[in-house]
Amino acid sequence: MSYLISIIMGYFLGCFQTAYIVAKRTKHIDIRDHGSGNSGTTNAIRVLGWKLGMLTFVGDILKAVLAVIIARTLFESQLAGLYAGAGVIIGHNWPFVLKFKGGKGIASTLGMLLAFDWRIGLVAWAVASLAIYLTRYVSLGSILLVTIMPIGVFILYPGGTQELIITSILAIVAIYRHKANIGRLIRGEENKLGVKKQAT
């Protein structure tokens, strides 16, 4: 029951759509009508600029951190925290308040990892940041970040079956949601950060 409560609590926190709220408050626009149509960090950077994009990034990280800490404290369970983080990602990707049209959950995934096990989060963040810096492909960094997640859990949590299942599912879903980006990466048509081209 504690895991179910954690997921539900996380879901409602995840429905707090930072990009949507920031865009409405500052530019009076629906960010889903601009750029890629995504309510996430990358689209916020492209549509709203770096400062507001980073505000979105921090907000999406913090809601996952908050959910993990609340669940872990409330139920005295590290695993409950992971379930809450998963709930945030689900809520971010499919928020009922925006007719289930949200982002791709990468910033929230990072927040979940940093709160669940900072070692995994830090490595994932470093690898993703380096990839983005070298290639300017945010999608590549995002894919690497979520790929590292179950690998880190496998290494640091031997016997942690539920942890491995949860993080593997989240990674698979995140990669699937980047399928269009992967296609463009293969064709050499993917947008580079800081370069205006087609929407992603």
For each feature predicted by the language model, list its residue ranges:
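Cytosolic, membrane-interface loops and tails of multi-pass inner-membrane proteins
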Residues: 21-51, 183-200
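C-terminal ends of transmembrane helices
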Residues: 19-22, 91-101, 128-135, 179-183
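Interfacial segments of multi-pass membrane proteins
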Residues: 45-48, 71-74, 91, 106-135, ...
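N-terminal signal-anchor transmembrane alpha helix
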Residues: 1-26
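Nucleotide and nucleotide-moiety/phosphate-recognizing core
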Residues: 2, 6-7, 52-58, 62-96, ...
